[in-house]
Structure formats: C-alpha cells, structure tokens
A protein has these predicted regions:
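Structural motif
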Residues: 38-47, 92-95, 181-189
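Generic structural marker for isolated residues within well-ordered, non-membrane alpha-helices
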Residues: 50, 66, 84, 123, ...
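Residue-level detector of well-ordered alpha-helical segments, enriched
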Residues: 44, 48-49, 61-65, 97-100, ...
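Alpha-helical ds-nucleic-acid-binding substructure associated with the helix-hairpin-helix region
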Residues: 4-6, 22-25, 29, 57-58, ...
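Conserved short-loop catalytic and cofactor-binding motifs
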Residues: 50, 89, 110, 146, ...
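Alpha-helical scaffolds flanking conserved acidic
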Residues: 13, 43-47, 79-82, 120-123, ...
C-alpha cells in the first residue's frame, strides 16, 4: 500500500501547507484558524461502533449515548451479543441503530487486514455490513486508519462549511462535494479537518466527534 498515513501534527502541518497552494480559500483561512486537531483514533470494533453511534445525531447526543454504552460494557462484541433489545434501548440506541449494532457484532470484519488495504477497498469491505454506509466507512478510514486522501462528502458539517467558505447558495450534495474534494488530493483528510474547524469557528459548535 502506497497511501500516505497521517501519524502526527507534523503531517497536518504538511497537508495544510500543500492545501494553501492548491486552494486560495484555504490559504485565506488557515492563518486565522486555531490548531487543526489531529483526530487520530484507535482502530477495531470499538471505534467502528462509536462511529455508527455518531450517525445522524448531534455531537452532544452521540457523546451522551457513547458514555452510556461504555458504562454498560456494550462496546464489547460479547456483551452486545448477550444484550437484550431493551438493554440497548436503555443506553439510548434507536430501533434502527440496534439492528446496525447487532449487524456489526455479527460481522466477520478483519480489522487487522483493513490496515493494509487501499482506502477504496476498506470502504467496499465495510459497506458490506448493514448499517455502514460511505460516511461511516470514510470516517473510520480517516480517523482510525489515518488515511490522508479520503473525504466524507456525505457529512452535513463539511457540506455546510464548504457552502460558507465558497459562498455557495446551497450546500453541495454528496456527489458534488466528492467531486470538489478531488481537487484537494492527496490531502483530502486534512481538508476535511480544516473544514470541520472552520465550521466550529463559524457555527460555534462541533461538527464532528
């Protein structure tokens, strides 16, 4: 695998320098931004489960649910398999999310082999599991595997940040933003981090966990 892996804050700085040359709008805002977070996470079942919990809910709501899940021990495969639906509802999971969580617990994902797969293959492998769409797979590749050239164009905060920064009338669609983000290769994941920080600055709230 020849893909660049984001390992440290120095990688973020390198990516920001490259993005300044690629996109004038980025060049304008980077000096005005606080430190762009590294956002590297561990990989494995626990982190993928956490990303599923984050789907289509606010950062605050996801954090609250995740705290309850960890307290109950439901961040472990064996505990989820033994849990009743009511026990999973009690920690804040919706009926649909319970299905997704059980699907993940029963999946045969080889987390170790994901580390050396091309990003496109990682997304393909993960999205075979019910409840894992492109957004979840791309966020996992970005934060847990450290891939530098992956974006999550289905993310509403990234869409809104792009609309604000580029003075667009409407948020770009997932398809439109995917096309736009290709211009930021090979540092799409750093562009995403920059846009989330810009969203936070403009909206005074976090756009990503």
């Amino acid at each position: 695998m020849e893909e660049r892996i984001i390992m440290s804050q120095e990688c973020i700085s390198e990516g920001l320098a490259a993005l300044s040359n690629l996109e004038p709008k980025f060049d304008q805002i980077i000096p005005k931004m606080d430190k762009i977070p590294l956002r590297r996470r561990s990989d494995g079942f626990d982190r993928l489960l956490s990303t599923i919990v984050s789907q289509q809910v606010s950062v605050a709501a996801a954090d609250a649910i995740w705290r309850k899940i960890k307290l109950a021990g439901f961040n472990k495969i064996t505990k989820i398999k033994k849990a009743s639906d009511q026990e999973l509802r009690d920690v804040g999971l919706s009926k649909q999310k319970i299905k997704y969580v059980r699907s993940l617990a029963n999946s045969k994902i080889d987390y170790r082999s994901l580390r050396t797969m091309p990003t496109s293959q990682v997304v393909k492998e993960l999205t075979q599991v019910s409840g894992i769409g492109n957004w979840t797979a791309e966020i996992y590749a970005m934060f847990s595997l450290g891939r530098a050239d992956v974006f999550a164009p289905g993310d509403l905060a990234l869409q809104e940040a792009t609309r604000l920064l580029f003075n667009l009338k409407e948020r770009p669609s997932e398809k439109e933003l995917r096309s736009i983000a290709k211009d930021w290769s090979p540092w799409q994941a750093v562009a995403a981090r920059l846009l989330w920080s810009y969203y936070n600055q403009q909206k005074k709230r976090e756009g990503i966990r």
